[in-house]
Amino acid sequence: VHNREIWRRLEAKEITHDYLREERFKYIMRAIGVEMSNELSDAVNTQFLDTLSNYTHLIDGTIELLDFLVPNYELHILSNGLDLIQRKKMQLSGLGNYFKNVVTFDTVQVRKPDREIFEAAMNLANTTPENSLMVGDSIDADIKGALEVGMQAVWYAPNAEISSYAEAHHIRHLSELKSMLSGE
């Protein structure tokens, strides 16, 4: 609950990325009445990021979908995550060769849903919104941001009700994206 709240505050621009890095564990500990020193918070955060970068669980159907997409489309990653973490996760999960570019907060200093990060990604990919499709799991960060810049959007949400965004397709399984793109 507390981790989701601090990330919500980051997306709402109530706090900075630096604040998140420095305060996330202090915030959680304060919620249970424990004060944490800066040194301990830094150590816990460093260990957390190292552990997080080694977590490489793939959603069912990921490899099959990527194998279908790569011959037909140029793929890029647009993430609010830390660049070092995203690249390590991609390397460890075997996904690195599927994607041409990785655009993160660290590389452009803005976060989704800000239009600047979408525009930076499209510039790097040398493409236009009309020729771009954002597939994401966050209505607020991924879908709203993509639609705002004129991209098409697909909301991946296995357990959610149908999207209230009529312009965004909603899929519950990655195989649905393959069917959608191949016209099945």
Where do the protein language model's features map onto the residues?
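Glycine-centered short loops/turns at secondary-structure junctions
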Residues: 72-73, 150
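Short, flexible coil/turn micro-motifs enriched in small/turn-prone residues
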Residues: 8, 74-76, 131
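N-terminal helical cap/lid subdomain that shapes the substrate entry/recognition surface
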Residues: 1-60
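Asp-based, Mg2+/Mn2+-dependent phosphohydrolase catalytic module
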Residues: 39, 63, 67, 78-184
